[in-house]
Amino acid sequence: MKFNELKSFPVECRQSSMGCAKDCERKWLCQYRLGIKLRGGEYKEAATLGQIYHRLQCLGPGHEVEVRAEVRKQQTALMAGVERGEDLDGNMSRLASNLTMLYQKAEVMAHVFWKKFPQPEYFTTLGMEIKHSVEWQDGLFITGTLDKLLILSPSYDAWIRDHKSTGRPLSALFGGLSWSLQGRIYRILAEDYIRTVVGSMNNPVKGFILDGIITPGIKLCKADEKNAKEWKCSVETAYLRRVEEWYVSYEVKAEFDNKANTKALDSKAMLFTEPLYP
């Protein structure tokens, strides 16, 4: 296919495309308007860790085996690409070799978060990882993925819940929560999804819950094997215990240093008080 034969995709207003356009307009044109992607793969450790963590959070406790199987399947697909000669810059083999480590870290992050912020029983899950698109003015599409859509009992109000992991202080996540663009876009998507897909007019979207957790700076290593023998537990349990201690020490050190945000994980809710449309 020749370059002049490519057909452009409709403009989508979504977080990833807007971020790409801000960083590099040429990449945005190729990837999001023309559908051109580089052969091979990109090595983005934080993004891959976040994807695995998101998957664990969406499925919830008890589904670790399922997510682990998905990671193994991804590893197999990456190595198959390497054998076909698609690994032009070595990123595919690098990612495949590090996926196990990233899964181990994501799993302990999820367990630490579930322990401190379990989902309340008065919430029921209407949907998970909901991909939805709304056609806006002049052919503009608002698109996004809702991590979770929850129904509050007994009022039947709907709440959006989003999970984020970061290497920065949580103040970078929660600082602009009340006026964030993401919360407004997700509100539009959630209301349209409930009305057009669920077919309900009795579940008004009341608010946005944002969960944040800082990525731990340690990974499973020989120290956990040594601790497992000493504590008479599995290596995974020893690693979980060491990560829990890391989170405690992070918050203690942040408080000692008089930092503005001393928390390593948090969950905050924003109630929608303004009408969606003027």
State what each model feature region is.
Residues V11, Q15-V65, E129:
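Nuclease catalytic cores
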Residues C13, I188-P278:
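Metal-dependent nuclease catalytic regions and adjoining charged, substrate-binding loops involved
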Residues L34, Q57-G62, W114, L150, ...:
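Hydrophobic/aromatic-lined pockets within catalytic cores
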Residues G35, S133, T166-R168, I214-G217:
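Short, solvent-exposed loop/turn segments at secondary-structure junctions
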Residues E45, L49, L102, A106, ...:
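Hydrophobic (often cysteine-bearing) scaffold residues that line and stabilize catalytic clefts
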Residues I52-I130, E135:
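A non-catalytic, helix-rich entry segment at domain boundaries
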Residues T124-L126, A158, N203-F208:
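Residue-level recognition of the N-termini of beta-strands and the immediately preceding loop/turn
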Residues G127-I194:
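Non-catalytic protein-protein interaction segments used by genome-maintenance enzymes to assemble
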